[in-house]
Amino acid sequence: MNPPKSAPDAQGLSYRDAGVDIDAGDALVDKIKPFAKKTLRDGVLGGIGGFGALFEVPKKYREPVLVSGTDGVGTKLKLAFHLNKHDTVGQDLVAMSVNDILVQGAEPLFFLDYFACGRLDVETAATVVKGIATGCELAGCALIGGETAEMPSMYPDGEYDLAGFAVGAVEKSKIIDGSTIAEGDVVLGLASSGIHSNGFSLVRKIIERANPDLSADFHGRSLADALMAPTRIYVKPLLALMEKIAVKGMAHITGGGLVENIPRVLRDGLTAELDQHAWPLPPLFQWLQQHGGVADAEMHRVFNCGIGMAVIVSAADADDALRQLADAGEQVWKIGTVRASREGEAQTVVV
């Protein structure tokens, strides 16, 4: 029997030769530990680096229900790569999940992230994770763990993908599911910070067509900064509102815009009628509509059009809710009312 052929003169291979740099991964962990530490809150048991992250549900909950959400940043990342701007997409990642679980009344407790790339650039990854930690601080949740996956040939150099996972808790008796929404209720709209993290495939197509100077001034900042403005996190002002006022329903205005997200919290037979003149269309959306020739109906089903969160309360509570949110620093408008649906009508209409 012949022995297996070998190459005695060839140098032995290492994981680094295959494209995975374990030392870079270790260096990243060292860089991000201080960011994660700033997000620690009551309930965290242990620190980053264990096989699993431990969290004790706060004792203030008598019948806690856990609420989970997961999301990404979508093709906004392609614009981040083009601009070499990585400091805000981490906040986007957190916002997409914590705002989603917030609408059911949940207080975000902890967050985990997944960062995938072909070749790990420690500085870029650390910048992204610093943004994630900033988002967690704004949401009051702990960055409790994550995964960095360096996968040679899976992604081009300089590119990466992100996913985030948020878990929160709500008292079982205080779950917000839209079941109490009734005719005559008022829809409040909280201002977005910009495009947030949806519709960027269309945004990039408009940029391709218009070929603008992204460094040019756009209402006091560069057009690039306006396009990349991080998604607003509504957690703290809305949790405070829920302590004082009976919030009947909330909708995070993400993919599908106003007309496809508000119906997710409405019972059959109800329609939210929104007045498009009740709030100003921000200049960035005007620019996108003008340079893309985008129809009004398409704008309303792709973009948030200046409204990042819709909150539904009774007519009797509407003024108090407006006042409290404004005092908390939110821009907010009465943007519509709830009424009985007409035959064959959509559950959200913009007039």
Swiss-Prot record:
One protein family per Pfam: AIRS
The protein's enzyme class: ligase
Keyword field contains Transmembrane helix: no
A Gene Ontology biological process term: 'de novo' IMP biosynthetic process
Location within or outside the cell: Cytoplasm
InterPro entries recorded: PurM-like_C_dom (IPR010918), PurM-like_C_sf (IPR036676), PurM-like_N (IPR016188), PurM-like_N_sf (IPR036921), PurM_cligase (IPR004733)
Catalytic reaction list: 2-formamido-N(1)-(5-O-phospho-beta-D-ribosyl)acetamidine + ATP = 5-amino-1-(5-phospho-beta-D-ribosyl)imidazole + ADP + phosphate + H(+)
Keyword 4Fe-4S among UniProt keywords: no
EC number: 6.3.3.1
GO cellular component term of the entry, any: cytosol
Alphabetically ordered keywords of this record: ATP-binding, Cytoplasm, Ligase, Nucleotide-binding, Purine biosynthesis
Pathway this chain belongs to: Purine metabolism; IMP biosynthesis via de novo pathway; 5-amino-1-(5-phospho-D-ribosyl)imidazole from N(2)-formyl-N(1)-(5-phospho-D-ribosyl)glycinamide: step 2/2
Main localisation: cytoplasm
Gene Ontology MF terms in the entry: ATP binding; phosphoribosylamine-glycine ligase activity; phosphoribosylformylglycinamidine cyclo-ligase activity
Domain of life, per lineage: Bacteria
UniProt record similarity statement: Belongs to the AIR synthase family.
Record's protein name: Phosphoribosylformylglycinamidine cyclo-ligase
Encoding gene (name): purM
